[in-house]
Amino acid sequence: MGLLTFRDVAIEFSLEEWQCLDTAQKNLYRNVMLENYRNLAFLGIAVSKPDLIICLEKEKEPWNMKRDEMVDEPPGICPHFAQDIWPEQGVEDSFQKVILRRFEKCGHENLQLRKGCKSVDECKVHKEGYNGLNQCFTTTQGKASQCGKYLKVFYKFINLNRYKIRHTRKKPFKCKNCVKSFCMFSHKTQHKSIYTTEKSYKCKECGKTFNWSSTLTNHKKTHTEEKPYKCEEYGKAFNQSSNYTTHKVTHTGEKPYKCEECGKAFSQSSTLTIHKRIHTGEKPCKCEECGKAFSQPSALTIHKRMHIGEKPYKCEECGKAFVWSSTLTRHKRLHSGEKPYKCEECAKAFSQFGHLTTHRIIHTGEKPYKCEECGKAFIWPSTLTKHKRIHTGEKPYKCEECGKAFHRSSNLTKHKIIHTGEKPYKCEECGKAFIWSSNLTEHKKIHTREKPYKCEECSKAFSRSSALTTHKRMHTGEKPYKCEECGKAFSQSSTLTAHKIIHTGEKPYKCEECGKAFILSSTLSKHKRIHTGEKPYKCEECGKTFNQSSNLSTHKIIHTGEKPYKCEECGKAFNRSSNLSTHKIIHTGEKPYKCDECGKSFIWSSTLFKHKRIHT
């Protein structure tokens, strides 16, 4: 009995036979032959490269290759075992119809020794090694392979070596065009076609094209909302089996992929790979439109939709459209009121898993992402990224209408409504309308007088958490917002914005009634009330109304008699901070208001105004 060579496993075609094959069949033939040769080379059987392989690698027509032109390979495989892992050859048989024989277990007495083997056991060792070559041929019956605690049944390909490689997590085959790597050479070959293959599979629904028919099939499910893969545990359904497999890990809680840098563990190796980029700062996914780079291909896909304005997922309830199907799913919960994510600690429920994750940190108090510039810590890396822009002054989000730039995309979205004038959220109590639902929620607290945010230092309460945060800086003296022009620091970003206009002199908000211009849009809104006579802030004690909430707050002190602003020099107290500031001048002797006519100085601006009448 002879030994198996590459000649024995190669399939040949005449010119007539080759011309009967279509492009897909020719490509399949080429892939099978190259894969067979690589398997022999891997075991050290194929030493020199046959002419057929050279021809196929150069993508030339192999029909004119004759069997005697193929270089005979050194002996390597025992034909007894080869019958079980390689198909019978013959030009008359189509390579597509070749079926791998079922492997029959045989006892020691039935084993034929490989030429050169000294014992049955040695021959058996060779046999075990060749089981890994069973690839690229369809089998008539699946075989099972136990790996750790997993039992996998292979119906399409019998390849134990491939299975083992997946579990060692080694990815030796790297793509030259990008940073992606693969555990199998065939996977790399398939991936490379992204760069070379024409996207011939087109979606009739939206016109999107794909490299693979299978990808098109998966994509079509986004339009039909078909989700055939259902979780038995919670009933959640998925449109792809891979997403279903990923979801199942959430029930087991297993996270075998650990980051060596920070110790964080993940359920998927791909998630670990993406996570590592936080430490390395690597952003391999670049937008060809604007040059912006991302650490994840999914983030790049989302970003690209900003350029084309694509929003394929539409809500049937209200007509609102979204970039992602997952965003649509979350949005639908606003209409249904569904809150599937429940906190085990306090039983609070949420409509989004991300909100539950954020909420959980309230119980742990963990803030792992720290700013190197000022030491401030954050729950999320994205929040840290946004915070850093305060220090760098970066404003990547620009309004196409007026050119104004912003630190955050959400701020740009808010700003755009200024141009449209749309205010869809209306207060049922007073009729006031707002751009955002959050602003309406905050406004309603004026009517209910609810102030849930209390200062631990002085017990003062606020209706907004942001107002409490700003207030706390009075006690700490923190002023994180610094002017690059003059170095002056402020406790609020809005105050810094207003201050910067002193240097530029810009007053972009103009009153259409009288032409007066203002630095801030909020100041313009307050000014307009002079013309309209609107006074929305009413004192419950005496019924007096005011056009500004600050004036109402000052007025209320008349009824309470409270004087919170005390002079450290003489102990005199005042109901306004401005009155205290004016009073302090008595102790310092400062007279900042000077007459240009005679040089006389005054403590008060009103006194200077009266004095000027002497000259006129």
UniProtKB/Swiss-Prot annotation:
Q: Which InterPro entries match?
A: KRAB (IPR001909), KRAB_dom_sf (IPR036051), Krueppel_C2H2_ZnFinger (IPR050826), Znf_C2H2_sf (IPR036236), Znf_C2H2_type (IPR013087)
A biological process (GO) of this protein is:
regulation of DNA-templated transcription
Main subcellular localisation: nucleus
Listed Pfam families: KRAB, zf-C2H2
Domain called KRAB: residue spans = 4-75
Disulfide links within the chain: none
Alphabetized GO MF terms: DNA binding; zinc ion binding
Q: Which UniProt keywords apply?
A: DNA-binding, Metal-binding, Nucleus, Repeat, Transcription, Transcription regulation, Zinc, Zinc-finger
Q: Which GO terms describe its cellular component?
A: nucleus
Q: Where are the zinc fingers (C2H2-type)?
A: 173-195, 201-223, 229-251, 257-279, 285-307, 313-335, 341-363, 369-391, 397-419, 425-447, 453-475, 481-503, 509-531, 537-559, 565-587, 593-615
Where is this protein found? Nucleus
Q: Fetch the PANTHER family from UniProt.
A: IP01015P-RELATED
Query: What is this protein's function?
Result: May be involved in transcriptional regulation.
**Family (UniProt):** Belongs to the krueppel C2H2-type zinc-finger protein family.
Record-given protein name = Zinc finger protein 726
